[in-house]
Amino acid sequence: MYAVIETGGKQYKVQEGDVLFIEKLANEEGSTVTFDKVVAVSKDDKVSFGTPFVSNASVTAKVLCHGKGKKIIVFKYKPKKGYRRKQGHRQPYTKIQIEKINA
């Protein structure tokens, strides 16, 4: 059994027990999160697609930790003009574990 959920503007295919790195959520570590935006559910070799979401379907997950991703360096310059700008960015994420798929 698997489901496709939408969170943070992205879609993820999940199964029970999966560990995911998703866009940062405001929930505390150790708390549970329910995702109601389920795009598709597969159960007993039958796939149900939503329009846009499957009704009466949800996915429950546990928040494991929060963190920051690898540093990305953004460097802009204009040749022959002495214009240089260097900036770094680390994207925050939330690590979750899928506990249950309700369909």
Curated annotation (Swiss-Prot):
Keywords per UniProt: Ribonucleoprotein, Ribosomal protein, RNA-binding, rRNA-binding
GO biological process terms, semicolon-separated: translation
Pfam family, one: Ribosomal_L21p
InterPro entries assigned to the protein according to its UniProt record, in alphabetical order: bL21-like, bL21-like_sf, Ribosomal_bL21, Ribosomal_bL21_CS
Disulfide bonds: none
GO CC entries: cytoplasm; ribonucleoprotein complex; ribosome
GO molecular function: rRNA binding; structural constituent of ribosome
Role: This protein binds to 23S rRNA in the presence of protein L20.
HAMAP family the record matches: Ribosomal_bL21
Protein family according to the UniProt entry: Belongs to the bacterial ribosomal protein bL21 family.
PANTHER family recorded: 50S RIBOSOMAL PROTEIN L21 (PTHR21349), LARGE RIBOSOMAL SUBUNIT PROTEIN BL21M (PTHR21349:SF0)
Subunit relationships: Part of the 50S ribosomal subunit. Contacts protein L20.
Record-given protein name: Large ribosomal subunit protein bL21
